Amino acid sequence: MITVILIFSAYLLGSISFAVVASWLFKLPDPRSYGSGNPGATNVLRTGKKVAAAVTLLGDAGKGWVAVVVAKYLGNVLGLGDEVIASAALAVFLGHLFPIFLAFKGGKGVATSAGILLGLNLWLGILAILTWIIVALVSRISSLSALLSALLAPLYTYFLLQKEMLTITVLIISILLILKHQSNIANLIAGKETRIGKSS
């Protein structure tokens, strides 16, 4: 029962769109109505409001981190296995991608996945974030940074954690993230992908 409650709570937490919340707080247009239409930090940044984008980034990453850390704590206290952590990680990620509060039309999960990785292991999260930053500095393309980080995240997880269940979980999250970036992949191939800080 505790596991079911944890999974459901993680999904509801993931369903909170901080892009929409931040836009409301800073009196900005709904992030689904401009730019890429994606309720995420990169799209909010297109308004020029860096603080709103930062709130979105921290909120979306934070919910992923909280879900995993709470699952790890309960797992230790109750003697539960990695399955609980994996389930919470997937639930919060799916909540972000398919939020019940936004008619199941959510973001692409980049910040939330970063929070999940940080929750699983600090160095794992840092390594994935550094990958994103390096690619972003070179290319100035957010989606390319996210895609390369997603491709490498399962490998980082395997070598750092040495846990099959969590590696598979991160692999699933990476696959879902990549699938959410299909339009970005098409734009990258066509050389039309928008660069960071510019309107689409």
Curated annotation (Swiss-Prot):
Keywords annotated in UniProt: Cell inner membrane, Cell membrane, Lipid biosynthesis, Lipid metabolism, Membrane, Phospholipid biosynthesis, Phospholipid metabolism, Transferase, Transmembrane, Transmembrane helix
Q: List the Gene Ontology MF annotations in alphabetical order.
A: acyl-phosphate glycerol-3-phosphate acyltransferase activity
What SMART domains does the record tag this protein with? Answer: G3P_acyltransf (SM01207)
Its BP terms in the Gene Ontology are: phospholipid biosynthetic process
Q: Does the keyword Disulfide bond apply?
A: no
Q: What is its EC number?
A: 2.3.1.275
The keyword Flavoprotein belongs to this UniProt entry's keyword annotation: no
Family classification: Belongs to the PlsY family.
Function of the molecule: Catalyzes the transfer of an acyl group from acyl-phosphate (acyl-PO(4)) to glycerol-3-phosphate (G3P) to form lysophosphatidic acid (LPA). This enzyme utilizes acyl-phosphate as fatty acyl donor, but not acyl-CoA or acyl-ACP.
Under what name is this protein listed? Glycerol-3-phosphate acyltransferase
* Source species taxonomy: Bacteria, Pseudomonadati, Pseudomonadota, Betaproteobacteria, Nitrosomonadales
